[in-house]
Amino acid sequence: MKRIMNLYESCKTPIRVAYFGFVLIAIGFLIQNESVNVFYTFRSNIILFIAELFLRIGEFMIMNLPIIFMLNIVCKRANNASPVVMALVGYFTFVVTTMLFSNQSLNAQAYSTGFGINSVFNYSSGTRLPLETGMIGSFLVAYATRAAFIFSRHRRDYSITNVLSKDTAGIIYNFVFCFVLGIIVSYTFPSAYTYLQRAITFIGADLFDPFRIGVYSVLDRILSICGMNNIIRYPFWYTSAGGSFANTVTGQNVLGDVNIWTYLKDSSSTYFGAGRFITPFYVINMFIIPGFYLGTLFSMSDKSDRNSLIPLFIFAIILSFVAGNPLPCEFVMLFTSPFLLIAYLILVGVVSGTLVNFEAFLGFSSKITNTVIAMPGSFADFIINIRNASLIRSVNTILIAGVICFVLMLVITMFYYRYIAFDFVRTGKGAQVIDDIIEIAGGINNIDRAGSGLFKLNIYIRDPEKISFEKIQEIGIRRVVETKNGLSFELGTSSCAIAQRINRRLRA
């Protein structure tokens, strides 16, 4: 748990950037959204310009999240500015290496067009592009940079640090490390991509099979976290893998789930099943994610901490409704409670299959064609679809499934924080941590009560003079803060369970 919280601390700022980026995108999206324009149309050029500005800035933030994560990790871990330069050199070395060494015969979604890096060297078929490695590539480079930084700080016989400065040596080491990583990824990525293509073929073989749609939804969320969801979204949203619709009157053939939904929305034609790949997002954004937020909030037993965070959680829930993208919340789950992320993915897969089984289909249309920052399943799209009489059955099914998923996610989250998070891997250290905390506080009789905040344990002390500060150094808890009422321990998601057990001892 300590390692998980250390990683969370390293990634806390990029997660905030993700939230802020989607706030900007949501503002721009709402102003330009056709669903909102049904109720009110913004005609001011200034407002439309601001919307476009926010949309593009937010898009740039989200598209470059892997680099932001990488830079923040190397800064936090090294507590030094020089790793930033090392990381950038290493990242571009890694990217260029994947461009020159990788197989260029994969689908276009397997390659990245970021930063405009390309090459026509020794490639007769066209331009070579780097592989789209997303978060995986950025984390590989981050830890390669960390290793290079540490390696450059140790002087050895015949080491280049005896000739060059430590920072220069670190850059050279990282160049070599990232070059090797780039070659390894160049030859292993196509194999992994082949399996993804098989999954896409498997899903596309029967677009009405609940299991296949469930697999799609789980893969979509996993690849979104990895920053690579365009690999699976583009084929189903915009190509024949997501279905096709032929207008017998005009002879027009429309490909892809999102394209079909958009076309049907603007015409009088009908097509059963359009929106199947978008429908689960309404449940995710409006019910499952709020269930996680409220479950986390209700798990805090310290009223002062809980009350101070209520506005923040309300804002996060509103953002989930409006922005229609669960990615920031999924980052929080990944870096604080992987168990909850797994439970969340299972729930997403099950509800996706269930919606198809009950023939509930509800799509979305948007001017945003970038699948990475697309916001399907927003409240604005949901409201506008309620007005369509032919969609009432789908809307009602989504509401029923959503309420059930909300309750399930709420219960799972609270159960995890209160019971499972305590000594999750069953190392036997959970009880020892409680004993150590009681000893630090000066004994059980010196504790008035215990309460849990967001990833922290608050111990209210009767006599501050009895606190054993020497013991804090011995047990190696990541962070302990002395407050006006006692001590605050940063214990991660196990804080709630530990607070409950300490209070039980106080009542015994």
Pin down the residues of each PLM region:
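Membrane-interfacial loop-to-helix junctions in multi-pass transporters
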Residues: 46-47, 63, 132-136, 166-172, ...
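Structured cytosolic domains appended to multi-pass membrane proteins
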Residues: 435-508
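Early transmembrane hairpin of solute transport permeases
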Residues: 3-158, 165, 336-349, 353-358, ...
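Inter-helical loop and helix-membrane interface segments of multi-pass membrane transporters/permeases
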Residues: 31-55, 96-132, 159-163, 193-204, ...
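Transmembrane alpha-helical segments of multi-pass membrane transport proteins and ion-pumping complexes
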Residues: 14-18, 22, 26-30, 64-71, ...
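Hydrophobic alpha-helical transmembrane segments
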Residues: 53-67, 122-140, 212-237, 256-289, ...
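Transmembrane alpha-helical segments and their short flanking loops
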Residues: 44, 48-52, 249-251, 255-270, ...
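Aromatic-rich transmembrane-lumenal/periplasmic boundary elements in polytopic membrane proteins
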Residues: 182, 186-251
